[in-house]
Amino acid sequence: MMLNIFRDSPCMNNPIHPSAVLYAGSRIFPQLAACEHFAGSEKMLGKALRIQAELSVDGVPIFDITADCEDGAPAGREREHAEMIAGLILSGENRFDRIGVRIHDVRHPAWRDELETIISRAGQRVAYIVLPKPENAKDVATQIAALDELRSRCGIAREIPVHVLIETPGALHEAWEIARLPHVEVLDFGLMDFVSAHHGAIPATAMRSPGQFDHALVVRAKCGIAAAALGNGIVPSHNVTTEIRDANVVREDARRARQELGFLRMWSIHPAQIQPIVEAMRPDFAEVDEATTLLAAAQDAVWGPIQHEGKLHDRASYRYYWELLQRAQSTGMNIPADARQRFFS
């Protein structure tokens, strides 16, 4: 596969990395693992951490872990549960600093204590905070303001990303406003609560496949979330599948979420779901091969226009292939040694 470069390729001692040149001051699209695994109990979180280490490729985890305060904490023991999670985040078992935390929603009395416990103890290492069940953008803004106040009080300079769980009609209606709020890097879809919020108008069959990909209101919601997220330069994350025994069902759900609806990430609620989700979310191998060849030639041309198989490529196509190559790397695909050296060393 030959590339005809319009100008001579300079011999560069210090080649320019794509992230430094392809975005021209605009926000760089978040590059996150394709799978987000939820666990609530200390036992299941410990198991998830071991699997995260076992499945890592070249020191990069192929899935994130979300420690769950909302559904994981026993009633009345929310603070103790948050303290346990903070301890895990600070522990040596957390090798990659890719543990996020879902706190309670803004109407629950425990959410402020949970957030304060996590940020005051583990704010330097928590990967992200998940905010569930907002009714509108104001709810999200309230919790983000509390997060920022805690960061300031605790002397935490780093940004702590926020993931927002869209699972009510009101939040769906304001998804674009939510996606524009500070620190938000993911919009998640909560299918079960979304269906329940429609008072029986959406049948229970839409909570699982194939109904979740067929019912008009559910598909509309998914398309709206993906469009709002991608339109604001953040990641759309697909809901769970309730199937835990048949890996083919999990894989097909993830494939449809990715290819039909534009989701770049998906929840897992059982360890057996992780690998099928990651596999289904991987880019096509042929496109990865093309990306490595094209990006190497573009870098040699100092990111100027090049010709490839009779077609002109410039920075717009470079951004596409660069983000594709990053997805390949984050899902554990085999990246040629030259591309690893150029872009990921």
Which residues does each predicted region cover?
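Expand to "…catalyze enediolate/carbanion chemistry for C-C bond making/breaking, isomerization
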Residues: 2-345
